[in-house]
Amino acid sequence: AVLYAKEKKLPFYILGKGSNVLFSDEGFRGVVIEVGKGMSGIALERAGVVRVQAGTSMSAMAAKMAEWGLAGFEFAAGIPGTLGGGIAMNAGAYNGEIKDCILTATVLDQSGRVRILKADELELGYRTSIIQKEEYIVLEAEFYFESGNPEGIKAHMRDLNSRRRDKQPLEFPSAGSTFKRCLLYTSP
């Protein structure tokens, strides 16, 4: 779909679940390409290494990691949206973020070439990455997680979701987080 839109010189927008997206009431004159159920596979490649497609819900991925006894993605249990967008913005919460566990991301670059970027090439920072800067499209990614106790991982996820419910009005529509967390420095 992306290559077709480029060939026909049609403006296009890649959309996952639509979290962190606000469209104008005037609409979008172009093609909206949904990355969702058709790109939502999760596979255990080898001990601790998981390959996940970009359309996978971050919450579904967190649940699957817990089921498989893989620790380190609990922070994502309540994050709306898909993995592709999560990687692009280095999504995170409760002292965890994508950059803590990603090994590689397979992306489509602006020339239509598929590239595999290692974690350090992704330039993951606080809610930013090279994916945003270069307008890459995430196709899938590989992650590494340590083994853990499935019940302990699930309990940690329940605790984080409880804290999230206590602090956020989840029963109401929301545009999500508005402000970045400020980092404060003190003089030595």
Predicted regions span which residues?
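Flexible, small-/acidic-enriched active-site or ligand-binding loops
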Residues: 121-130
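Solvent-exposed residues in well-ordered beta-strands and their adjoining turns
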Residues: 36, 108, 143-148, 180-182
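Conserved small/polar residues in nucleotide/adenosyl-binding loops
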Residues: 185-188
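Oxyanion-binding "anion nests"
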Residues: 152-172, 178
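Residue-level signal for inorganic ion chemistry
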Residues: 1, 18, 112, 141, ...
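A gly/ser-rich beta-alpha-beta helix-loop segment of oxidoreductase catalytic cores
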Residues: 62-103, 174, 178-180
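Anion-binding (especially nucleotide phosphate/pyrophosphate-binding) glycine-rich loop
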Residues: 1-83
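Structural signature of FAD isoalloxazine-binding scaffolds in flavoprotein oxidoreductases
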Residues: 22-40, 88-118, 133-140
